[in-house]
Each structure stands twice: as C-alpha cells, then as structure tokens.
Amino acid sequence: MDKEELTAWALANGWQIIAGWPSLTKPRAPKEAIVRMVFKATVVNLEVKKPAGKWEKVSGEAYGKVVADPETGRPSGLGFDSIPSFSMLMQDNKDRLMMERLNGGRKG
C-alpha cells in the first residue's frame, strides 16, 4: 500500500487528518491526536503520543511490505493486529465521527 491507499483506508476507518497526518484521537478529547501514521519517503511509521507529549514510534514498515488484508482491508505490518487497543480506538473514533455526521456536525 502506498501513502494514498493508507490515507484512504485510514479515513474510511475512523481516522482524521490532524496536523497533516492520519490520526486517532482520545474519545473524550476528539481534537487531540494520540496515534498517528507518519509518511516518510520509503516507510510509514505508526506513532503514539506519550503522556508527556512526545511522539514515540511503535512500528514502521516499507510501503512495499504493507499489504491490505484480503478480508478486512486492514494494512498488515503496522501492528494493528498485535495491539488490540488500536482496534478499539479505531472503532470508538469511527462511531464518534458517524454520530457527528448524523447529528449534522454537532457532537453527540
């Protein structure tokens, strides 16, 4: 998957662009990114924001090695399957964004 494919997947799965990167937010603070995908020239990194505010890389992979799962479409190689909290956070973000859209842009 390339940068555009990863971005399209992320936006369809509850991520939003914050400060130029596809990001997941805290459920209670929907404007503050706590997980982000950072695109470099040849690799994509998954970073998590530490409580002190510093970003820490938790995984990374060359674009050529990131492949969409044939059943779920989820990118492999970035740790989404090995860290269950990412799935829950993505679902929380996706649900919140859907509720905002249903409410005409207002927070649920």
Can you name each region flagged by the protein language model?
Residues 1-30, 105:
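Negatively charged, low-complexity tracts enriched in Asp/Glu with abundant Ser/Thr
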Residues 18, 38-40:
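Short beta-strand micro-motifs enriched in acidic
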Residues 2, 28, 34, 41-108:
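Intrinsically disordered, low-complexity regulatory regions enriched in serine/threonine/proline
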